[in-house]
């Protein structure tokens, strides 16, 4: 059995998280959601996988490679322009023509019993088997009706309340016979629910429903992304969490440094090289990515934070999502439902009101109150130089790269033959920065 992982969507409703990262690589408990799908496929014996890509395709290929590091064989087809769910699969026809194959979304989270789904398809003789689930609000999904033998009789994509005729939805997980390729032309846009399945029903083909109560969620917006992490933390969905369970409900990666005076309240997932300083409180339903630093007396509750983040002293974050490479300085408050994109800096005593979104690389000045989302433009500090010159946190604000560029900038104003003296204290970080400044001067 082979599988197609649909991984070409732009994830526009997940922005600013997907401004620089494809949606399938958005982490759920520190592992890309598509990697959870690959794990599920491998668990059920499906190791030949084709991924359909479009948005930021190179990043997905770079992460997964040929799949050997994940116990599978992975190949790719890339859409130059979006071709719809079925049109994308048509591009992989040559790799899928030797028998029934599975189609699954690379940006949904599920622990569906794929073995049972495949067995049901094999025994029914159907041309297509669709995994279905009953939900309380079907507005965002494709709705289907089945008869008493689970044969699908009608489809409707994303109905209004007045159009709803069923609470049974299409999960986007299919087992398909390769004969369906005859319904499509390569390079044209086709959708399974709008085009192919209705045509198959019209021609009398058997399209079977497989109703499941296993966990499944479409990570279609920021709230669903946050909830998917909470569901994984609570054990509602069965998946593998990176790291070791160091105490009930607390997972930690390698080389974590947790001060004895720090508090960690389960369930929590800590990535590799996470540092929790004295007095830090990491509350329940929190995920911290690799190389995150939580400074003294900072408090994080129900916060999803990606890698390489810094949370300053007495900072307070609750029920928010913070992407990678963010610097949250001392006494900063981030409200519920807010989302901070990659590479932002929040100055000391800044306040981000609830439900605010900051697009990547935004800078919030010290003491500022952000009451509307920042999408366009960049708000920079007034000056590089403060009262004591250029100052900042070592390896957070003053990085080796920054020190090198500072030396280059200063050196560009010097005349040939001029002498510059540098000095430092005994701290290892100061020694590194000093050498970087010297290297910049000499370059």
Predicted features along the sequence, with ranges:
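An N-terminal, well-structured beta->alpha segment
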Residues: 379-439, 443
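Conserved N-terminal catalytic core of the sugar/cofactor nucleotidyltransferase
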Residues: 2-5, 13, 27-116, 146, ...
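Glycine-rich hexapeptide-repeat left-handed beta-helix
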Residues: 293-390, 394
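Extended, small-residue-rich solenoid/repeat segments and analogous flexible loops
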Residues: 188, 201-301, 305
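N-terminal nucleotide-binding beta1-loop-alpha1 segment
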Residues: 1-19, 380
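Catalytic-core segments of class I nucleotidyltransferases/pyrophosphorylases
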Residues: 100-102, 109, 115-122, 135-138, ...
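A short, conserved acidic/glycine-rich loop-to-beta-strand motif
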Residues: 124-134
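Short catalytic helix/loop segments, enriched in acidic residues and glycine
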Residues: 20-33, 400-408
